[in-house]
Amino acid sequence: MKYILVTGGVISGVGKGVIASSFGTLLKSCQLDVTSIKIDPYINIDAGTFSPYEHGEVYVLDDGAEVDLDLGNYERFLDITLHRDNNITTGKIYKLVIEKERTGEYLGKTVQVVPHITDAIQEWVERVAQTPVQGSSKPQVCIIELGGTIGDIEGMPFVEAFRQFQFRVKRENFCVAHVSLVPLPKATGEPKTKPTQSSVRELRGCGLSPDLIVCRSEKPIGLEVKEKISNFCHVGPDQVICIHDLNSIYHVPLLMEQNGVIEYLNERLQLNIDMSKRTKCLQHWRDLARRTETVRREVSIAIVGKYTKFADSYASVVKALQHAALAANRKLVLVFIESCQLEQETLVSEPSKYHKEWQRLCDSDGILVPGGFGSRGMEGKIRACRWARENQKPMLGICLGLQAAVIEFARNKLGLKDANTTEIDPQTGNALVIDMPEHHTGQLGGTMRLGKRTTVFSEGCTSIIRQLYGNPKSIEERHRHRYEVNPKYVPQLEEHGMRFVATDVDKTRMEIIELRDHPYFVATQYHPEYLSRPLKPSPPFLGLILASVDRLPQYIQRGCRLSPRQLSDASSDEEETYVGATKLMKSLQITGTTTPTNGISRNACRSSNSSTISTVSSDIEGACGGVGVGPTTTNGHGEDIGKE
């Protein structure tokens, strides 16, 4: 087993997660099985109760573990399935050691940080490194990311553990990559290497010497700066890797390859890589990176959320949208809308902000209502669901988004004006969303319905979402929720047009809803974003993107296969315009008329649909129409339909 430890210096958030994932991507391209471990030196047992504003999203694994969002990077980059033990926290280690002490395993010894805590860390790493993460084969390389920065007091037991670990596994099996910031002050315009020198000095003072120094900078670093770091940090010039800010994280593995990382690791860790037998993995990454640069036609998606001030709160949602947009050959434009800004209270207190946010929502091509907890902003989510339903706007709801859609439908279609969730109003007369029996109110951590669960489609179901998945009988997706749709109201909801197209295996929990006579109004109780991959986008997200650019019907007609041109990284606006014009001319020749029988331009459709704004309830009517632009008049495409 080979180990690569990735540490950080100067500041946190310097990009260790992406660097660690890129190491794994490069090694996988050499046909090596790779696993990852993330170490978080906080005392929490897991990330389940973290505030999204402080740590970003909580990522959920197959086994129900609530972990740091960096594990999502590992799974997406490497296309592997990690487990709860792949995330180590100080809390887990101390809990393990204390439990051993209580059961007498230390035979009366004084339990100390060294050796008991450090030994527990090393044993945990060795055990988890052997756990298969892709199929049944054991990994050959383990990438370990140590969270925080070198010198943090909470991380010192882990640094000491790895100081010992390098001798435990021998030098040829252990490598340290140190990621450090090289700032570029505007006053001088010159890269400063002193922070990196100090960081490396501190790392060496702890007993670890970096084999690779990965310099993060705003702009590319010149050879002179690279040689200076090499000289003062006692490493060879080929051991200094410069990663500047890039347009896409998909470029990072490619840049590291150009810097000779594979060759260095092959020699340093004695990997015996046969360069002639490398897989096409990196070619896929090259295509993906190139496509991010060449795609020009945009699709705008409004994320109506509760934590939009911190983008990492929706990290997996954003990644899933990016995967789907690239697959559909579109450039993603995200429109973050704080759901509380869509509520009546904002209209009274800040009318200009209220109208502005509603206008941004109306101008978007599609809407996504993600998950969340608590009452704040819930009414805004419900209003967004209503607008999407009444105005035929493509929408995807996730978790709380499904619950908001059900409550809105019950209020405005069933006439149950007090419909609500017991999370917000425990005394409501019409509890459309109720607490699950598994939820223990005395404890928050680990009490939700978590992890991968089976979702079964209804017999004879021909729904859009089922077709997007390939018409299976069932699917498996990851869950994270404490509340569910009240099954008592399902018959009433279905009678008025809301279809519950999938349930859990016991047919008691509603998992997916769709609306009849709507281009794309889908909501899931599970979180499809967790299983989206760059080369395998999540079906619900792909459906949202395609519906938002009027391509979903064609995609379904093709058997849910993207056209070669959509999968190409060389598509352009001119090419699509040419293809559309060619097909238009053919239709003219066939019909013998001056206008194709179905040749209604999208702009014409917009004009005819601009009146739909009047269907919005009176309290939000002026928000979308008051500034003179209808909800579907400016969605950023501006071209006639060229059906594929």
UniProtKB/Swiss-Prot annotation:
In terms of InterPro entries, this protein maps to: Class_I_gatase-like (IPR029062), CTP_synthase (IPR004468), CTP_synthase_N (IPR017456), GATASE (IPR017926), GATase1_CTP_Synthase (IPR033828), P-loop_NTPase (IPR027417)
Species lineage:
Eukaryota, Metazoa, Ecdysozoa, Arthropoda, Hexapoda
A Pfam family annotated for this UniProt entry = GATase
Q: What does this protein do?
A: Catalyzes the ATP-dependent amination of UTP to CTP with either L-glutamine or ammonia as the source of nitrogen. Constitutes the rate-limiting enzyme in the synthesis of cytosine nucleotides.
Q: Which CDD domains match?
A: CTPS_N, GATase1_CTP_Synthase
Highest taxon of the lineage: Eukaryota
Any idea where the Glutamine amidotransferase type-1 domain is? 300-551
What processes does the entry annotate via GO biological process terms?
A: 'de novo' CTP biosynthetic process; pyrimidine nucleobase biosynthetic process
Q: What class of enzyme is it?
A: ligase
- Supply the EC number(s): 6.3.4.2
Query: What keywords sit in the KW lines?
Result: ATP-binding, Glutamine amidotransferase, Ligase, Nucleotide-binding, Pyrimidine biosynthesis
Identify the SUPFAM superfamilies for this entry.
Class I glutamine amidotransferase-like (SSF52317), P-loop containing nucleoside triphosphate hydrolases (SSF52540)
Pathway given in the UniProt record = Pyrimidine metabolism; CTP biosynthesis via de novo pathway; CTP from UDP: step 2/2
Query: Which reactions are catalysed by this chain?
Result: UTP + L-glutamine + ATP + H2O = CTP + L-glutamate + ADP + phosphate + 2 H(+)
Q: Please give the name of this protein.
A: CTP synthase
Extract the GO molecular function terms from the UniProt entry. ATP binding; CTP synthase activity; identical protein binding
Q: Which residues form the active site?
A: 399 (for gatase activity), 527 (for gatase activity), 529 (for gatase activity)
| Record's GO cellular component terms | cytoophidium; cytoplasm
Question: Per the similarity annotation, which family is this?
Answer: Belongs to the CTP synthase family.
